[in-house]
A protein has these predicted regions:
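Tryptophan-rich substrate-binding surfaces of secreted polymer-degrading and adhesive proteins
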Residues: 1-146
Length: 146
């Protein structure tokens, strides 16, 4: 059991280092999400910017150092000034659509999401609209074009 924990910590450190250095993009982080630690209420002031954490079904990268020790509402999905959501280009790993916050979290060409059980691929950069609200910015993925 200790060996598995040590291996898991090493895997998490390796993917975090790649995220921080820019070697691992959001698609790579989501592909390795089983190795990414789960967010918890703690002090993030000494955590390097870009370090990935999982919260709910999403993967986020630390955007701004902060201390969430006494801030239970500073979760990545709510404290959007502190975290950046990751998107993927892999339809098999598509996550539910999440509205961007400001200039972060926008969908770029090739990013995928789900809405209503359907997988969509963004056909434009800086896409802030959900597929049903702006269908011309998305292409529905089918078995033929996945």
């Amino acid at each position: 059991m200790a060996a598995m924990h040590t291996a898991g910590a090493a895997d998490a450190s390796a993917i975090a280092a790649k995220s921080i250095s820019g070697e691992a993009d959001s698609t790579a982080l989501i592909a390795a999400e089983e190795q990414i630690p789960t967010w918890r209420q703690r002090d993030y002031t000494d955590v390097p910017i870009g370090t990935p954490y999982k919260y709910g079904d999403q993967v986020y990268k630390l955007w701004q150092a902060h201390d969430a020790t006494n801030q239970p509402d500073w979760t990545p999905d709510k404290a959007v000034s502190l975290w950046d959501i990751c998107h993927t280009t892999d339809p098999a790993k598509a996550k539910p659509y999440v509205a961007p916050q400001g200039t972060r979290g926008m969908y770029q060409i090739g990013d995928v999401c789900t809405e209503g059980g359907i997988i969509y691929r963004s056909t434009i950069d800086n896409n802030v609209w959900q597929p049903s609200a702006y269908p011309q910015g998305w292409k529905e993925m089918t078995d033929e074009n996945i």
